[in-house]
Amino acid sequence: MSWRGRSTYRPRPRRYVEPPEMIGPMRPEQFSDEVEPATPEEGEPATQRQDPAAAQEGQDEGASAGQGPKPEAHSQEQGHPQTGCECEDGPDGQEMDPPNPEEVKTPEEGEKQSQC
């Protein structure tokens, strides 16, 4: 004889989520990248908008003018600490992808490859 008890499953009541209210009609101008800035109101000061990339460029030029050239080769060495085995580095200093296991030939007992 099998015991037949009451099911404990109870479906959750469905909740109705109201859609967000529309403030006004949606215009394509609102989504354009080249929208003219709105005119400032009486209480707001007038500001000039600049391209963020151009503003960043101007800041970079002023900061690097007094420092001289950046040592690029030295900064790359700091990013990759030396482990004592540089066999993975390619001729240009970038790491090479590991070889395809299907293409790798197993060395014979007499031959030994350097392993890192």
Curated annotation (Swiss-Prot):
Biased composition (Acidic residues): 31-44, 86-95
Region (Disordered): 1-116
InterPro entries: GAGE, GAGE_fam
Residue runs in coiled coils: none
Signal sequence interval, chain numbering: none
Compositional bias of kind Basic and acidic residues: 102-116
Family affiliation: Belongs to the GAGE family.
Miscellaneous note of the record: This gene belongs to a multigene family expressed in a large variety of tumors whereas in normal tissues, expression is restricted to germ cells. These genes organized in clustered repeats, have a high degree of predicted sequence identity, but differ by scattered single nucleotide substitution. Their sequences contain either the antigenic peptide YYWPRPRRY or YRPRPRRY which is recognized by cytotoxic T-cells.
Name of the protein this chain belongs to: G antigen 2A
Taxonomic source organism: Homo sapiens
Gene: GAGE2A
